[in-house]
Amino acid sequence: MKKINLLGIEVKCHNKREESLICIIKRGVKDFYRTFKNKPYSIGDAYYRLFGKIESLYFMDLVNHDNYKLMTDRLFNLYIFTREKAENHR
């Protein structure tokens, strides 16, 4: 069983499918930082895509309720921070 750190929380993967899903989300979080430079208006879409993927981890029982709430809070803060940065960047 492999543990991957996602938004400051260790997520346990039981198989390759779970591991690749978490890696996709991790990449998505990294891309999120870069989005505002090229496409400030697509930040909202990127946020909802990531939010949906994190929700799927919750439904797959890979994260418990507290960790899910913590992740979504952190993701929302990241969204606000990135959106403000994008607005200042214009």
Predicted features, each with a name:
Residues 2-90:
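Acidic, Ser/Pro/Thr-rich low-complexity regulatory regions
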